[in-house]
Amino acid sequence: MLAAAEKAHVPIAVHLDHGKTLPCLKEALEMGFTSVMCDGSDLPIEENVALTCQVMDLARQYNACVEAEVGRVGKGEDGSEVKEAIASLSDCHRMDQTGITALAVGIGNAHGVYAATPHLHYEVLEAMRGSVRAYPVLHGGSG
């Protein structure tokens, strides 16, 4: 994948999704990934922000982009059930202050196929507009 991106005639981002530990994210950056997701969404917000700050310090050395997550996106990447948590605007602001490029927000969305019609909290995205610099990201949009 990295070799194909280097040969491309257009700009290509190579992104690691849902990296949960500093060693994992560091390895991806050392390999040449141009973007990583620091997924500390299962941590208390203080620990999530602290981990993201460490990843930001590392990513700057590689001129790489960082995506973080606040709230919880229902269903894990492996299909396991995850307790849904809607992102708070306060947590969005705290994470945005780390300097991340993009912010995945839990608004009632889930990975995989939805068992029932989801209730998405669009008001979170509306509240972010104009007050959060990072680009909003929605995971689980294809379910």
Where are these regions (language model features)?
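Alpha/beta enzyme core
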Residues: M1-H9, H18-Y135
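Histidine-centered catalytic micro-motifs
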Residues: V14-G19, Y135-G143
